[in-house]
Amino acid sequence: MAESTKGDAAIFPVDTRFQQMARRPGGVPRERALDGAQRHIDELKPDFNHWLSRELKQLATSIQQVGDNPGDEAVLELAHQACRQLRDVCGTMGYELVTFIADNFCEILDAIKAGATYDQNVVDCYMDALALARTDAYRKLRPEQVPEMTNGLRRMVELAVASAPRDVK
């Protein structure tokens, strides 16, 4: 059996493919790329309210189908997908409160997927909160500016997650 030698291991970083691509010559300078992206977002904002209305209607339709049959995984996945899209796009567009509500609603849907009880009152509360958050009075607010609402929504997530069955091994 060979004896091991004492010594320090040589640790060296290895660039990921993304890091290699980011450092390659050519391309667009970072600041110019960010300016271009922001300009594109600003161009999309006038049509955003129409998009948001359409997405909320789609989410409401999906949620109605989940309410009709909470055990249907395909219907639940469609609702979850609509909610995730709402969360992601609203985050990009700067609608922090809508993003917060949609993110918490995604957690509720995750809990239902994990076996938590479907509670129509919780779902209605989240849909009402989304409708309120998209109004002119609430649109530009951050979650910390409406603590009563956000604390209540967080509490509902905690209860939903706690009600999901846990795998005991």
Question: What residue spans do the PLM features occupy?
Answer:
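Structural secondary-structure packing elements that flank or coincide with functional cores
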Residues: 2-25, 127-166
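Secondary-structure edge/capping motif, primarily at the C-terminal ends of alpha-helices
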Residues: 59-70, 90-93, 109-112, 137
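Long, amphipathic alpha-helical coiled-coil segments characteristic
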Residues: 30-77
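Histidine phosphotransfer helical core of two-component systems
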Residues: 74, 111-124
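Generic structural signal for well-ordered, non-transmembrane alpha-helical segments
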Residues: 46, 50-53, 57, 77, ...
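Extended, amphipathic alpha-helices with heptad-repeat/coiled-coil or helix-bundle character
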Residues: 74-111
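Residue-level signal for short amphipathic helical patches enriched in basic/charged
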Residues: 47, 93-96, 137-140
